[in-house]
Curated annotation (Swiss-Prot):
It comes from the Eukaryota. Keywords: Disulfide bond, Protease inhibitor, Serine protease inhibitor. GO terms for cellular component: extracellular region. It comes from Amburana cearensis (Cerejeira). One of its GO terms (molecular function) is serine-type endopeptidase inhibitor activity. Belongs to the Bowman-Birk serine protease inhibitor family. Exists as a dimer in its native form. This is Bowman-birk type proteinase inhibitor 2. InterPro entries: Bowman-Birk_prot_inh, Prot_inh_BBI. The keyword Disulfide bond applies. Inhibits trypsin, chymotrypsin, plasmin and factor XIIa. Does not inhibit factor Xa, thrombin, human plasma kallikrein, porcine pancreatic kallikrein and human urinary kallikrein.
Length: 63
């Protein structure tokens, strides 16, 4: 899998139906490719987090 493929190691979902899930991963310099609302710090390297709310979790990045 490429590093740009959407994936998430730390995903949390609500128990509602449909669930509301978000990824808490911190990535360097960019968010995953499927992220629409990405926020990054101004540090070098930048630490970025995706703030999208989805009804599923992406597959884990590691393993």
């Amino acid at each position: 899998s490429s590093k740009w493929e959407a994936c998430c190691d730390r995903c949390a979902c609500t128990k509602s139906i449909p669930p509301q899930c978000h990824c808490a991963d911190i990535r360097l310099n960019s968010c995953h490719s499927a992220c629409e609302s990405c926020a990054c710090t101004h540090s070098i390297p930048a630490q970025c987090r995706c703030f999208d709310i989805t009804d599923f979790c992406y597959k884990p990045c590691s393993g």
